[in-house]
Amino acid sequence: MAQRIENIPFAKLINTRDLGGLPAEGGKVIRPQTFLRAASLYQLVPSDGEKLVRDYKVAYDIDLRIDKELSRQPDAPIPGVEYRHYQLREDVMENFERKRGETVGKMMTRMPTMAQLYLNMVSKENSLEALRNIFGLFMEDVVPGEKAALFHCSEGKDRTGIVAALIEDLVGVPRDLMLEDYMLSNDAFEKRNNWYYRGTRLIMNKEAADSFRDMYRANEYMLTDMLDYLEKTYGGTEGFFREALGFSASEVKAFKQKILQ
């Protein structure tokens, strides 16, 4: 039976959801205790880790962040959980910095849009290689109800949202529910986002501040544009798995059968 999309309460872990229960093709649903999405595990406390293992059967911690993020805020280890690092990021942002004497507004005109970054993460080879590794692990090692995978980036919004959307779209989760899951990240950071926006309006005009807001908020059009790109380029997410990621039709079919009930 399909269930309501909501964040799971933890002491320190935020923006965390089990994809289980989302309705899929053929009247089926994604199996619970299979995939969890979350924000950074940097501030994870022991009780959170125990809950992940006990209640959600988490066996793999899949970290999507770049090396620079890891060095500043490494994941807190969870006993019995295997850590994997697969960097999902297009290189264009890794060394992007504000130039000397440059205003924030001017810097914003040089930055790629978040929508473009989403497309890069499903088209550039470094990100495709990360996705091959991630979904290879999902296909081979994840066991619903026994060995679940938790995947996360810093906020559980963009990179995490892309991985979640690829799972959801592959198995036929309705688009409106995919977007509901994606947009729920804004609830987790609502107070911070409002504070950020007020701060940027002090140093930027409204147009620049609105543009900057795309960097720290989930926006439906960014995910929709990415999914539309996959449809146009590969005929959909299943075609993307076969043509861009290199999985066979039988591997994709077996994966879908494994994670649905």
Which residue ranges define each predicted feature?
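Cys-dependent protein tyrosine phosphatase-like superfamily
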Residues: 1-150, 163-261
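Ser/Thr-glycine-rich phosphate-binding loops at phosphate-binding pockets of nucleotides
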Residues: 155, 159-160
